[in-house]
Amino acid sequence: MKVNKFTKEKSEFEERVVEIARVSRVVKGGRRIRFRILVVIGDQKGRVGYGIAKATEIATGVKKAVSLAKKHLITVPIIADTIPYQVTQEFGSARILLKPAPIGTSIVAGGVVRIIAELVGIKNLVSKVLGTANKINNVKAVFAALSSFDPERVEQAKKQMEKLKNPKSEVQNPKQTKSKKDQIKSNKKVSNLEN
C-alpha cells in the first residue's frame, strides 16, 4: 500500500481515551477553557502506558497524551494470561487489589482496571477498586501495581505454572513399580512360604 499524507499508518499500540475533562483557568479577560485528556495505550503483549495532556482542542490533546504514553511504557509479566501473583497498591486515596485468576474466568474488573488489563493482554483477572473513583488516581495506582512485580517471585510463579502444565511422572518404568495391593499380596505370599 502506498503511504501518503492522507493514509494513516497502523500503530503497534491500541489507544483508548479514558477521560476527557473540561477544565478552566481564570485569567484577566475571563475564563480560559481547555480539555484534560487521559489516554491509555497498549500492545496486548505486555506493554502499556498512560499519558495526561491538556489542549484547547480534543484531537490535539489526544495526540499529546498518546506521545506522552509512548514515552512512559511499562512491561508487565504475564503468566498463563494472568498476573503472576496478588498485588495491592495505593495512590492517594485510591486503593487497587489485583488477583490472578484461573483460565476461563475472564476480566472481573470495572472502569479503568478493565481497560488497562485488556490493553496489556491480560485475559483472566479479578480486581477490586477501593477508595476513590477518581480515574487519574486509579490509573496511577494500577500502573504502580503492575510495575511493582518482584522478578524473583515472577520466576517462582513461572516455575509453578510449568509444573502444573507439565507434571513429571515420578514413575519412570511402570513394570518396576507395584501397586499397594500387589505389594500386600506379595508380602502375604512370602509370609505363607516362611510358615
PLM-predicted stretches and their roles:
Residues 1-13, 152-195:
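Intrinsically disordered, compositionally biased charged tails
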Residues 17-20, 58-63, 106, 110, ...:
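Amphipathic alpha-helical transducer elements in NTP-driven molecular machines
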